[in-house]
């Protein structure tokens, strides 16, 4: 109750989620699989001995980048490799994965004729938009600037003027023009954004929000969805999140943690902010102690905690709604009491004076 924007009749816009999954395997995408295998083995070898600072400064940025794009992953490895000891095999397999993806981009027309020849995140997403979301207004978010730069170029090549973008790498004035074009031009169907696109923008004209990558901070997900789920939106038009993620991976754990545990893609976070810091700490702890299954184990506990918090919030919202609804009555009653007291005091004054 009271967790979605509503119209004058009190109706709420619905939220929905659609999973778009792909497999990382030796048979389907060899070098992506090798890159993930090397990264996972390196993390597992440190399990139980990782410090909080190592997770925050090294492991978390690498995992976030890996499950975004090979461009972002290679960039993070290059940055961190200057400061920390990262195994040569981790770096080598990342380079090969990037080369493979760039080869696919150079031959994209052939790849799209047979997507099973290179079923990567990028190829699956292009195919899904072309086949399932044709003609829809779409906002696409990524937290990685390298992913934005790569996808923006590829999408412009594939979809032409239907695509525009907003990011820190685009001139500010040009980015504002791009936002306006997306909002006002019916032929502009896709807006690709980096994390700066999730701040204070009204994108309620869009039908879908696509998450190219999954942030570790759940408030970022809420910000993305909130660009579409705003006051004034047609409540008959649901806000649908399309989440593309790999299966049998840490990314799938994170998706289920957010979706099954907190239902964030279908329900607002309103009132749950108080437990967000604890949740973020649990994610980091899962990497330190049980990278392969830790988040799965936390989901039942998270569901109970979230349900308890939502019940509390609902009770408070009912109280607040009642307070707002009956405030005019309270004011009228207060005025009545003041008037009656004044009359009573006046009558006492008259009686005392003439007795």
Task: Go through each PLM region and give its residues.
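Phosphate/oxyanion-binding loops and surfaces in catalytic or ligand/nucleic-acid-binding neighborhoods
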Residues: 1-4, 39-42, 46, 65, ...
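SF2 helicase/translocase ATPase core recognition
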Residues: 7-41, 193-276
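Conserved Helicase C-terminal RecA-like lobe
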Residues: 11-28, 57, 61-190, 327-330, ...
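Hydrophobic, Leu/Ile/Phe/Ala-enriched alpha-helical segments that form helix-helix packing faces
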Residues: 43, 129, 155, 228, ...
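Short, charged/polar, low-complexity loop and linker segments
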Residues: 45-54, 126
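Short, surface-exposed helix-loop/turn micro-motifs enriched in polar/charged residues
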Residues: 50-54, 58, 139, 201, ...
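C-terminal accessory region of SF2 helicases/translocases
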Residues: 235-355
């Amino acid at each position: 109750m009271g967790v979605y924007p509503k119209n004058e009749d009190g109706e709420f816009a619905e939220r929905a989620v659609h999973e778009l999954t792909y497999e990382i395997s030796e048979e389907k995408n060899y070098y992506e699989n090798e890159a993930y295998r090397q990264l996972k083995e390196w993390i597992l070898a440190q399990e139980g001995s990782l410090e909080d600072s190592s997770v925050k400064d090294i492991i978390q940025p690498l995992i976030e980048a890996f499950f975004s794009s090979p461009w972002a992953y290679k960039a993070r490895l290059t940055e961190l490799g200057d400061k920390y000891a990262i195994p040569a095999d981790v770096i080598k397999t990342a380079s090969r994965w990037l080369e493979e993806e760039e080869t696919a981009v150079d031959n994209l027309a052939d790849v799209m004729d047979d997507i099973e020849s290179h079923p990567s995140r990028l190829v699956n997403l292009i195919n899904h938009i072309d086949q399932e979301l044709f003609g829809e207004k779409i906002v696409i978010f990524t937290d990685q600037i390298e992913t934005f730069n790569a996808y923006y170029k590829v999408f412009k090549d594939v979809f032409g003027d239907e695509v525009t973008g907003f990011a820190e790498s685009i001139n500010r004035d040009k980015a504002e023009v791009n936002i306006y074009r997306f909002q006002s031009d019916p032929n502009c169907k896709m807006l690709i954004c980096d994390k700066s696109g999730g701040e204070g923008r009204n994108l309620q004209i869009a039908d879908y929000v696509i998450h190219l990558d999954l942030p570790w901070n759940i408030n970022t997900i809420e910000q993305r969805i909130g660009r579409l789920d705003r006051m004034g939106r047609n409540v008959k038009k649901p806000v649908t999140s399309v989440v593309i993620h790999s299966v049998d991976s840490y990314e799938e754990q994170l998706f289920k943690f957010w979706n099954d545990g907190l239902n964030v893609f279908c329900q607002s976070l309103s009132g749950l902010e108080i437990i967000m810091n604890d949740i973020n700490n649990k994610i980091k702890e899962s990497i330190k102690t049980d990278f392969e299954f830790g988040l799965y184990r936390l989901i039942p506990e998270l569901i109970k905690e979230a349900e308890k918090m939502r019940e509390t919030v609902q009770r408070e919202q009912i109280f607040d709604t009642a307070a707002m609804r009956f405030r005019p009555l309270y004011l009228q009653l207060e005025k009545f009491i003041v008037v009656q007291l004044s009359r009573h005091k006046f009558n006492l004054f008259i009686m005392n004076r003439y007795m």
